[in-house]
Amino acid sequence: MRTKSFSLLALAAVFTLSACGGSQNSNSNSAASGAKTAGLDVNKTYIVATDASYAPMEYMENNAVVGFSHDILDAAAKSQNVKLEFVNTPFKGLFANVDKGDSDIGLASITINDERKQQLDFSDPYFEATQMIVTTDRNANIKTFADLKTRPASVQAATSGDLILQDLQGKDSQNIKRFETMPLAFKELESGGVDAVVGDSSVVAYYVKQNPNAKLNTVVDPSFVKEHYGFAFKKGRNDGLREAINKGLAQIKTDGTYDKIHTQWFGTPPGNSAAASSASQ
């Protein structure tokens, strides 16, 4: 069984979302006793659609969904007496799944952007990331994102990495190789089918650390903007679910639960200065 706790100091510096500190001795019962959100059905089990192929954020382990994003949503929900059931759902159809009402919440390390906000509503941000490039020694001349202008690169389809590569190479570029999951995109690089992978720093750094024999290298480009993850809801939904999750996020950031979960997964609390030092090496 893979352990949750690992040291990813460089990773934490690149994409940590600063959270409010607080006493870690607070228990969930104090949060659960708070005022009930108007319209929320506390007797209902809400369905969460998640693309569980995105370690360490959300992935399958022993036939169950685990990961940092899972733990954050689960803790936020429990603090408000909200019951959840997590269902593994391919990312490509996840937005439509939520939009049609087949699921109540979308959980897939979803970057909040203006285009997606036209289709879905989002929770408050719970994590900060950026894009990252992965190469091998045979492509050591790739130093910046601009170097991928005419180079074949793999991405997970419909992700932020896919979108920024389209901006660089053009939407119809034959050099963009799209895959259903990030592990498949990485395997394409390792087999020599592409020169690079572009993906979220959270997943990229974890994969590189977990696969040392692949001898992968990471490239951070200063042009990559910060991205914020949020939980997705059907546009215009007004049954109190999103409000409850936002209350829960605020609660776990205040009582120290967020910091505890972050440390379990990344080896350091958010905003740790030691992490920033390690990342610069």
Regions found by a protein language model. Give the residues of each.
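Ligand-binding cleft/hinge of the Venus flytrap
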Residues: M60, L73-N81, G161-E180, V208-N213
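Extended ligand-binding regions for polar small-molecule ligands
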Residues: G21-S23, H70-S79, T159, F231-T268
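Extracytoplasmic small-molecule ligand-binding "clamshell" domains
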Residues: N29-S109, D255
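C-terminal motif of bacterial Sec signal peptides marking the signal peptidase cleavage site
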Residues: T16-A19
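Acidic, polar ligand-binding/catalytic clefts
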Residues: K83-D147, P222-S223
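Short loop->beta-strand "edge-of-pocket" segments that line small-molecule binding or catalytic clefts
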Residues: Y46-T50, F145-S160
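A ligand-binding cleft/hinge motif common to bilobed small-molecule-binding domains
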Residues: A108-Q118, Q166-D167, E190-S191, D195-V225
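Periplasmic-binding protein-like
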Residues: A52, E128-T135, S201, A205, ...
